[in-house]
A protein has these predicted regions:
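SAM-dependent methyltransferase catalytic-core segment centered on the flexible catalytic loop
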Residues: 135-151, 157-195
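Charged, low-complexity, helix-prone segments enriched in Lys/Glu/Asp/Gln
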Residues: 1-4, 104-112, 168-170
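SAM-dependent nucleic-acid methyltransferase catalytic core
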Residues: 32-154, 159-162
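Conserved phosphoryl-transfer catalytic core
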Residues: 1-46, 177-189
């Protein structure tokens, strides 16, 4: 059976064992690396902008094929299916490399801050892209900025990506989200018109 750990972002200690670590998550990481990821997952708060930035950086190094990633079991572009991960480990005897999550995160943050911060003010919004225009105008006005966007970056959904949550299940687990709930909420029509 899986170990029970505190919920993502709860800030609780090890005594607050409320949710299991999925087997496919445990198989993806060296035990020491997993312990560090669990500590970060528990104590970083998604509603704090600094912690959210750090969580984003951590999600970016969660899995990939080079030494800068915490797990090498899958590419960094998407997560292999959970069942595939379990089958792959059983079939190949895959042993995850020991990585220091804190060192890897520090290196990632160093790469992110290699260039100076932009001098132009901006905003970031979280929500449905179909209502982004109205929300962006209001947020820009609230910050004393002109109420028209000059650049919009959205993610997800991507057209023709059918199951965004499913293909990012390891990252959604890290952030405390349910991949199936994300897929149920996203537009399955994959048409440009609603946007």
């Amino acid at each position: 059976p899986s170990a029970l750990v505190p919920r993502a972002g709860s800030g609780r200690g090890p005594e607050a064992r409320t949710e299991p670590v999925p087997d496919e998550v445990a198989l993806a990481f060296h035990p020491r690396t997993l312990a560090q990821v669990l500590l970060l997952r528990t104590h970083l708060q998604g509603d704090d902008r600094t912690d959210r930035f750090i969580l984003g950086a951590l999600a970016g190094i969660l899995h990939g094929k080079t030494a800068s990633y915490l797990s090498t079991i899958m590419p960094n572009t998407f997560s292999m299916a959970p069942r595939y991960v379990c089958d792959y480990v059983a079939r190949t005897g895959y042993e995850p490399p020991a990585r220091d999550a804190f060192d890897a995160l520090a290196a990632k943050l160093g790469r992110l801050f290699r260039q100076p911060l932009p001098t132009t003010a901006g905003i970031a919004l979280h929500g449905d892209a179909r209502t982004a225009g109205r929300r962006a105008r209001a947020a820009l006005r609230a910050h004393g900025l002109p109420d028209r966007a000059r650049l919009v970056v959205t993610s997800p959904p991507y057209l023709r990506v059918l199951k965004y949550g499913y293909y990012n299940w390891l990252r959604t687990w890290l952030l405390g989200f349910d991949a199936a709930a994300i897929d149920a909420e996203l537009d399955a029509a994959h048409r440009r018109e609603p946007y």
